[in-house]
Amino acid sequence: MAGGGGYGGASGKVDYVFKVVLIGDSAVGKSQLLARFARDEFSMDSKATIGVEFQTRTLSIEQKSIKAQIWDTAGQERYRAVTSAYYRGAVGAMLVYDMTKRETFEHIPRWLEELRAHADKNIVIILIGNKSDLEDQRAVPTEDAKEFAEKEGLFFLETSALNATNVENSFNTLMTQIYNTVNKKNLASEGDSNNPGSLAGKKILIPGSGQEIPAKTSTCCTSS
């Protein structure tokens, strides 16, 4: 399980650094989710992100120190200018839509297609329906998102960056699944140490197929 970690760049020994990318339409709350997770902050006057931005936070998972390096699209999505370099090296992704704006959910398949075209094929992905605090303005039923997540093999949660609902849970879920996948790949490599082409002894940050929790059993945890 993931434990609490330090906000910002914690010092000390780090066992793994995992790059995670946030993708989705503008104004769905990606930067707010990042600020809430990395610094436990929320600004009502948040402006669109300009320029490349990433923040870090160190977590403890299974007695290992894991540094989450979370990248924001920096507003490039408005110009469809997100490049392959943004996805390079990512082992996890948060696919974010605004549950009060149906079109942001309808654009998710396009974002997923782009992600899968540029990222490692085994990247761990969680679908996030943000702004769950605006339930009276909901335009995307939970069941629609659940069905899509199950079909595509994604994890799924609804969050609110405003009141912090499920923000910690969503990042912890993603980081734990990445760690489990990497750990299984390392064990498999060590078991294959007699193979001259083995990668035993190296830390592998790209997820393998592993035995991940099936999406159908991992999409039940939405905000209350």
From Swiss-Prot:
Lipidated positions per record (S-geranylgeranyl cysteine): 220-221
Subcellular location: Early endosome membrane; Golgi apparatus, trans-Golgi network membrane
Protein residues bound to GTP: 24-31, 72-76, 130-133, 160-161
Keyword presence, GTP-binding: yes
GO terms for MF: GTP binding; GTPase activity; kinase binding
Pfam families to which the protein is assigned, alphabetical: Ras (PF00071)
Gene Ontology biological process terms in this record: cell wall biogenesis; endocytic recycling; protein transport
Keyword vocabulary terms for this entry: Acetylation, Endosome, Golgi apparatus, GTP-binding, Lipoprotein, Membrane, Nucleotide-binding, Prenylation, Protein transport, Transport
Residues annotated with N-acetylalanine modification: 2
Tissues with expression: Expressed in roots, stems, leaves and flowers. Expressed in tips of growing root hair cells.
Presence of keyword Nucleotidyltransferase: no
SUPFAM superfamilies: P-loop containing nucleoside triphosphate hydrolases (SSF52540)
Superkingdom in the source lineage: Eukaryota
GO-annotated cellular components: early endosome membrane; plasma membrane; pollen tube tip; root hair tip; trans-Golgi network membrane
InterPro entries linked: P-loop_NTPase, Rab_GTPases_membrane_traffic, Small_GTP-bd, Small_GTPase
Residue window of motif Effector region: 46-54
Classification via PROSITE patterns: RAB (PS51419)
Membrane topology: Lipid-anchor
Subunit structure: Interacts with TCTP1.
PANTHER family: DRAB11-RELATED
Function of the molecule: Regulator of membrane trafficking. May be required for secretion of cell wall components in cells.
Family the UniProt entry places it in: Belongs to the small GTPase superfamily. Rab family.
Name of the protein this chain belongs to: Ras-related protein RABA4b
Species whose genome carries this gene: Arabidopsis thaliana
